[in-house]
Structures are given as C-alpha cells and as structure tokens.
Amino acid sequence: HKFAGCWQNKGLCMKKEEILRKLRDADDYVSGQELCEYYGVSRTAVWKAIKQLEKDGYVIEAQNNRGYRLIENDTDVIFSKTAIESYMDTVQIGRNIVFHKETGSTNIDAKALAEKGEPSGTLVVADMQTAGRGRRGHGWVAPAGKNIYMTLMLRPDCQPDKASALTLVMAIAVYEAVCEIVPKECCGIKWPNDVVVNNKKICGILTEMSAEPECIHYVVTGAG
C-alpha cells in the first residue's frame, strides 16, 4: 500500500475518505462488489479501508450478501483528517490537509509549512491549541472538543496591500457556513474579523503575511 488508507490498483488510488463518503451518502448497505467495481480495486483493498475507518472510530456494520453500512451517531461526531477530507469537493482549497489533535497554533504551523514549500490551499486543522492568538497578540482559549481551529495558507497573485481582503473572504465563508444551521437573520459579520450570532462572537479571524514590497510569498488566514 502507498500509505495508510490508500491502495494502488490499475493506476487508481482509493482512499478511506472516499469509502466513508460512499457509505455516508448511501441509504442502505453498499455491497463489497459495488465498492470494488466503483473504485476498480480488490475486495482486500476495500476490507482494509473499512478496517482503517473502524480504527478511526467509525462504526460500520457488515452483513453477508448485503455489504457495509455506516452507523452514524449525531452525538458522537468524529473529528479527524479523514472526516474532513470526506466532505471536500474543492479543486485547490483544502486538498492538502494537515490535522493535529493538539498543536500550539495553526497559524504558526501553516507559516512553517509555507516556508517548506507546501502548495497554496494547504489547510491546517486542530482539535486543540495551546498557544492560540487573536489580533494584537491577544491570547485565544482553545480547548479540545469544543470548537474548530483552522488556518488556510494561500499564495495569492496580488499586491500586498490587497491581502487584507482575505480576512473578509474568510469571514464571509464562515458566515455562509453558519447560516446553513442557524437562521440567517441571527448571523452577522462584525468588521473587521468577527462572525457573530445573536450579537455574540462565535468566530475570530487572524490574517498574517510574508511579503516583499511588490509581491506576496504567502498569506495565512486563521479562523477559530
């Protein structure tokens, strides 16, 4: 196997997040044969992917002559790289995800990855931060299992004085996501970097940049 959760067969690569997406979208059992044919892989490869998902904490029911079925519990959400990737349908943003159960700061991590040459669109996500920061260096309380902490690294082709617009772009993205689960009239954006629900802050955004006078090396925009 190429790496845990991904197997090569006939030039195709099947990742466990793809299996997870297939099971989650299904209304009933999905047969092993259907998974084999859909991804062009062997039954052994499918079995290994299922076992990897179970190791990650997913409950998957298997029945002879029926296949596999994902047992989901809304009160026990699994927060992992696999879970995040299974929802991704973007072309560039978030196609390279770095996930930490615990880290100091996702912004610091994203800047380090940018310096190492990671591609634009790299997304750093953490379940807990021990050195989270807000604007003007203010501390940011970031316990595990309570919130979302993420930083997106981009290499935009624009002048440095335009980079601050990415803070608003992130705020709009968070706002639109929140509006999918909260009545739109309750949500808002408080300039320049907060998202609010019922006039209470639910998200702060911090944008940092490495640049020269005429060009940007990279920008990291963190949201928590």
What are these regions (language model features)?
Residues 15-179:
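N-terminal lobe of the biotin/lipoate ligase/transferase fold
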Residues 3, 11, 125, 137-138, ...:
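C-terminal regulatory/effector modules of DNA-binding transcriptional regulators
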